[in-house]
Amino acid sequence: ILCEFNYHTIGFTYTENDKKNIKKIYASESAAARQGKPWTKDILYRELSKVRKKAENKPYLLDEFLSNNKSLVHSSIFFVQDKDQGEKVAKVVSGYTDRFATFYEGKSDKFVNMLSTGKIDALVACERLNEGVDIRSLENIFLIATPRAKLVTIQRMGRCLRIDPNNKLKVANVIDFILESDNEKNKTPADQYRKEWILKLAEQKKV
């Protein structure tokens, strides 16, 4: 860990539309098995993760969180699954600052420079921004859509955990969406596992 950080979690549940999409996935899995082409667990998890990453009420919950934590929109990156989700998140962000940009494809250098020099407050971006980005002044990361791979989460968190020589007392913020469900079938161990290890990291303090 490079600098101290606060870990904020936003619990979310599936909407009726999300649940319908999950039922369709299990129906497709059953149909494939009947046809003699059973899915592997990886295929099933991948399909279910698409619903989790793009859960319908995430933009609304993000808006609710930002309304109580307006300062966190500044010096931040919002990681989303794709352009479709990104546009919904961007609409929420626009309610708190008009100094933001979106990045979904191409080269990120221009946007990274704008963020690092303070020309924009926030950047809504997809997974292409995971690696090779060094913005020492960056303070906040929003994990809107997070894959199961721990390495990807570490890379994303690393964007805001760099030591800033111009702000030696820097304390970053990691905001994460965690699935909460009463339905055992819909529970995602990946979210709970991620929450546990990030919480342990957040407890570490610099000496």
Regions flagged by a language model, labelled:
Residues 1-73:
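Interdomain helical connector at the RecA1-RecA2 junction of SF1/SF2 helicase-like NTPases
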Residues 99-206:
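Conserved RecA-like P-loop NTPase helicase motor core
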Residues 22, 89-93, 132:
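Hydrophobic packing residues within well-ordered alpha-helices of enzyme cores
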Residues 79-104:
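Conserved helicase motor "Helicase C" RecA-like lobe of SF1/SF2 P-loop NTPases
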Residues 75-77, 121-122:
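Residue-level preference for the first positions of well-ordered beta-strands
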Residues 60, 87, 91, 113, ...:
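Alpha-helical elements of the RecA-like P-loop NTPase motor core of helicases
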Residues 1-2, 68-71, 94, 114-118, ...:
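Conserved catalytic network of the ASCE P-loop NTPase/AAA+ motor domain
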